[in-house]
Amino acid sequence: MAAVLVLSSAGVALTQATTSFADTGVNVWLTTADQADKLTPQSPIAFGVGGSGDVITVNPDATYQSIVGFGGSLTDASAYNIWNSPSRDAIMDNLFGSGPDGISLSFLRQPVGTSDFSRSFYSLDDVGPGSSDPALSQFSIAKDQAYIIPLLQQARSLNPQLTFMGTPWSAPAWMKTNASMLGTKDAALQPGDEAVYAQYLTKFAQAYQAQGIPISYLSVANEPAWPPLTYPGMLMTPQQQSTVINDLAPDLAAAGQNTKLLAWDDNWDDITGVYPDQSYPKQVLAATGANTAGVAWHGYDTHDPNAQTAVHDAYPGTDVLETEHSWTSGTDWPGEITGQGSDTAIDALRNWSRTVSFWNIALDANGGPKTDGGPTIDNGCGCTAPVTTDGANVTYNAEYYVLGHFSKFVKPGALRIDSNVVGSVNNVAFENPDHSIALIADNTGSSAQTFQVSYKGSSFGYTLPAGAMATFTWPGGATRFGTITGHQGLCLDVQGANPADTTPVQVYTCNGTTAQTWTVEPSDNTVHALGKCLDVQGGATANGTPVQLYTCNGTGAQTWVPQGDGSLYNPQSGRCLDDTGGGASTTRTQIFDCWHNDNQRWNLP
């Protein structure tokens, strides 16, 4: 390791380490088509050991989208299965926990009311036949509180970085043209009910927020181009979707909800001139402007995610989220690893998606339950899930391990970085907020593939079996030194340049002193100044807890994980470093809910 002399932005001379990646260890996890390995750690390898074959070059200087998360949906069916399993806590730990067996799922797309995987059909505002409730006086989430919401709360306690999205399959029957939750008779939202439907969705976001489940993303209709005959759904034209979004955005803002709206939430179909093609989301984006944050996509039908890139290129400031795809056989490990791992997950991520979301999280041995005494559902999905429950038995299917190759190693806020595809080895790479690198590779071919991975001039070799998937991780960052600037260009500052324990940390006019010279250490996610650590006072976790300088002690109060949006996240509290009050000099910093606003954006050295 060599040392070089650099200047901080304040002109202070600093000694900065530069890293050579020769001999750097690479950790490997492997899943094989024959099930001999299931996300199994392999013997570490190292850069500099050489290799042969085509070269995958991982380039951290070419960056793309930041990651929101990986997961699926705790549908009514999924929640019912997990809730009633004697292994409930173990299942939840394995899905959302960060322990050795947990895969740290970080994204959940939740139905607003019923979906096609529900034990009964219901909305959040049901009234009797022939009645209506435009005042929404009968709105209630009581059915969700039986087992869905408790599991969502448990999931968030296991992974505080979990992001929630909401999606309605149907408006309440009294708002629809066929007066039914089903999609029969080309069911649609009644013209003129767009405003009350927007209020209905706003009340959903408020009610879930009150339960400690913030809805970060919301679409207004699941698969709006498809009117299902035997389960809830409804058609919605681009024009009507635009009207709903333009009503909903100000309603959410007035209700204090920091919720982003997504257009479409339907398939990757990309047949020019054949409805629905890319014109649907483009029409909505054009008609709604800043009210729509992005586009949600499903991986069915054409199974070609290039439509994501086409719409992203036309509207480059918008988010792309892949929000649903399911497989039909949990026992087809070769097909599942390729279909869900390469064709869905990797390809979606290489086409700008910030999420990978499969469908149901857990189903029973019959692929359900779907209804309880209601009409027979024919949803065309002989679906499996990451988890199968069968009485006291629990099976973790191929989808579980495929998701784990991403969610366990690619953290929210990670940036996708450039990597090239070689032969049958499809792949995607990321730089995490702690600057570690994760490369996920999937050999879609029928024979083993030998290749090299090159990073910053060093390389290693690997042979990936046919139909197998591997995740490679290695430390990618180096210690950084300099100023940390925040809102209105003010610097993070140790008050009075006092190195004593409990000295407040504030924002202050940048002056180039040592009180504003910080060390950002990616190896342990600490931030130092004057020989001590940035610290949450008393190790507390509540909103508004002050931030101070304190002797470094290795506790969670001193862990700060940089996020892709510029925030500094404290995992122990589940909150972010916040410039209290919005940017006046001498304002003390605190921790607060991560709203990702200007008060929480920091420019690191």
Residue positions per predicted region:
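Residue-level detector of short, conserved catalytic/binding motifs and their immediate flanks
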Residues: 54, 68-70, 103-110, 162, ...
